[in-house]
């Protein structure tokens, strides 16, 4: 059985992280998002969020969960799995 390999450069959620920040009223700055994630117990910096949004950094599963929680969106929406999912 052949193993399928997927080539993913960067990550699948960068654009959605940026959009999720912009949807907040007022919009969340990268610093604000990093602070929220730090308060949940995970180390995060503005630089990490910037690199995620620019597709320059991979995102681990635990980070995806924390990003979704901090942004108030579903994992499906954040990952672009379900285009119709409510954020």
What residues fall within each predicted segment?
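A short, Lys/Arg-rich alpha-helix, primarily the initiator
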Residues: 1-26, 76
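Hydrophobic micro-packing sites on short alpha-helices
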Residues: 33, 63-71, 78-79
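Short, basic-rich loop-to-helix N-cap that marks the start of a DNA-contacting helix
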Residues: 47, 54-69, 85-86
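Short alpha-helical DNA-recognition segment
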Residues: 25-52
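Short, charged recognition helix plus adjacent turn
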Residues: 2-7, 69, 79-87
